[in-house]
Amino acid sequence: GCNYLDTANYEPKDEAHFEYSWQWAYQDRFKAAGLTAILGCGFDPGVTAIFTAYAAKHHFDEIHYLDIVDCNAGNHGMAFATNFNPEINIREVTQKGRYYENGKWVTTEPHEIHKGLHYPGIGERESYVIYHEELESLVKNFPTIRRARFWMTFGQEYLTHLRVIQNIGMARIDPIMYNGVEIVPIPFL
């Protein structure tokens, strides 16, 4: 075996869904083999967990409500560009939303919950509740949390292009036949 480092989370090729429980299931085997696995050591997840731990230790007696906000104010100068691996980003943004409240996971339709949030130095941006993997580890490791949500910003042009990609079937993750060849649309895109 070997040690393992993951900046995000495992996501199966055939399902637009991910969760830490799949990787946490390996903990005892890694420990027995004397191996280390570090999950979620990117920015979100990763730095977001460090910020939460720092706030819990230095600023609060307990954390009850946690909203993580991810605002990308960048401009690629293109009509449609993702800020992460395009396939993973499209899968992440088009799946159902999920957040934690009162000991339960609440599932929403994609982009169902949104509002304008003010970001210092950037201004107001429309922000959407999406599911992001660090919510799982944060509610597990900070049991006083009553509600945890992850918000991400998207411009209307981005969302319009995303809807077109979905409507023409290019966000699909199941194989289709194209000119006698089997392809999976989203990686082909």
Give the residues covered by each predicted segment:
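A generic structural signal for alpha->beta connector loops
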Residues: 1, 34, 144-147
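C-terminal catalytic/substrate-binding lobe primarily of soluble NAD(P)-dependent oxidoreductases
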Residues: 58-189
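Rossmann-fold NAD(P)-binding glycine/threonine-rich loop
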Residues: 7-36
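Adenosine-phosphate binding glycine-rich loop
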Residues: 26-73
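Short-chain dehydrogenase/reductase
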Residues: 20, 42-45, 49, 128-132
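Glycine- and other small-residue-rich loops at beta-strand/loop junctions that grip anionic moieties
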Residues: 8, 15, 40-44, 127
